[in-house]
Amino acid sequence: MTYGEEEPVSPMARVFQSPGIDLCAVTIMGFKTKINPDVVLDALKQNVSKHPRFSSILSDNGAKWIETEVNVEDHVIVPYIDAEEIGEGGQSFIDDYMSRLTMIPLDRSRPLWDIHILNVKTSEAEAVGFIRSHHSLGDGMSLISLMLACTHKTSDPDMFSNAIPSMKRRATMSHSLKTKGWFLRSIFTIGSTMRLLWNTTIDMLLLLATVLFLKDTKTPLKAGADVRSNPKRFYHRIISLDDIKLIKNAMNMTINDVLFGITQASLSHYLNRQYGTKKEEDGALTSYRNNLPDGIRFRVACTVNLRSDIGFKPLADMMVKDSKCRWGNYFSFIFLPFTIGLQTDPLVYLKMSKSMMARKKHSYHAALVYFIIKIVLKVFGAKAAAELFDRPVRNTTTCVSNVIGPMEEISFRGHPVSYIAPSSYGHSHALLIHLMSYADKMIISLAYDPTVISDPHKICDDMEESLKAMKASLCERGLL
């Protein structure tokens, strides 16, 4: 094996491959046709193997990327599958196969990625591709940009699948206020700045408390100390993106607001059912519908993209040095306090979500966390930075990530893609929720610890039912 130029590893990449943290990103892609492995190999040789991160290995101390030659055949695995033995249990076979992979680390003697081709029919696809890469290679935005560079529009095979809008962050001052006099603008600026400083101060104090002692309530979704060493399983559900957009427009909010409202509602109903089951087992089930204990502290770690250009860019633009949409792990976390409780009006969850997200957007919490991790890494080393990153994650309950995907169907070398379900493993949570839009679909993708959560389908059932209840409530009020 030959080696070439060396390049420093980014701060978050150092954290992700530190001792005790081995975070891997996965992308599960369902295809409408059987996958031809030769076509995949040819495409990888032309695209992925030439990418700096996918053709580099880590130095012994994990501080530098070292360019190396890539034998693509070593990274594409096509297991032997006895179709007769599997029968109608294609999805179970795929689930078990992917779960076993979460216990097999990537080979650090070569670039940290592999692709598994499973030509097994399920209810949603004719074949499934399982793409695994170490999170130090790049975050979700980076990996999806790479995926788009390798795919084309199904409707026009000659066009690359660049059907994702580029977006800028919203201005803090409305257009109508900008047209007012200087005095009103000054008052708004002073008030907004004071609120920003106050919110940031409170958020950082809560972060410090979470690092030191503040833990979430132990619930049926809260992980134990050994969660990272347990195998993980994956489950996904496809719901209507159009329904989410209808609610978004009717409630004058963002897609994110709707998704977090749905998530908050569904987890409340799921936990209520779990506590009800426990009371029944203990012989103390009451006739009350609400089985939730009072005062549940339930926080969600939410990933935040730190790039100034928050939409997707062509891969070539992301690889340019000092680009505003650069490749890498340029994201941080904020912690969202979910109100776990039953509401008679499903729209209350949406209103709470909108208020919560508006408050969190007006804070420098995410940027400061990233900055502090960089300083700790530089002064105290990767181990201390990894502990600073992982401690608040361990003390919260779950993590939610939302990624915008292609607005129309894409194909990989003549293989139309049915769905895309991103996820990850190696984290300190028993439940990870990824949400990704694709064409007219929204894919709910769960990574979970089966020793803690035995019924992930019920979480997705609750999300689906919550969406229907919100839409029905808006229809009853004549808002749709």
From Swiss-Prot:
Could you tell me the keywords of this UniProt record? Acyltransferase, Cell membrane, Endoplasmic reticulum, Glycoprotein, Golgi apparatus, Membrane, Stress response, Transferase, Transmembrane, Transmembrane helix
Q: Which residues are glycosylated?
A: 252, 395
Q: What class of enzyme is it?
A: transferase
Which is one Pfam family of this protein?
A: WS_DGAT_cat
Under catalytic activity, the entry for this protein gives:
an acyl-CoA + a 1,2-diacyl-sn-glycerol = a triacyl-sn-glycerol + CoA; a long chain fatty alcohol + a fatty acyl-CoA = a wax ester + CoA
Phenotype on disruption: Normal wax ester loads on leaves.
What tissues express this gene product?
Expressed in roots, stems, leaves, flowers and siliques.
An annotated Gene Ontology molecular function: long-chain-alcohol O-fatty-acyltransferase activity
Q: Where are the transmembrane segments?
A: 194-214, 330-350, 366-386
Q: How does it sit in the membrane?
A: Single-pass membrane protein; Multi-pass membrane protein
Q: Do you know what upregulates this one? A: Induced in roots and leaves during drought and salt stresses, and upon abscisic acid (ABA) treatment. Up-regulated in the stem epidermis during active wax synthesis.
Protein name per its UniProtKB record = Wax ester synthase/diacylglycerol acyltransferase 7
Instruction: State the species of origin.
Output: Arabidopsis thaliana
Tell me the name of the encoding gene: WSD7
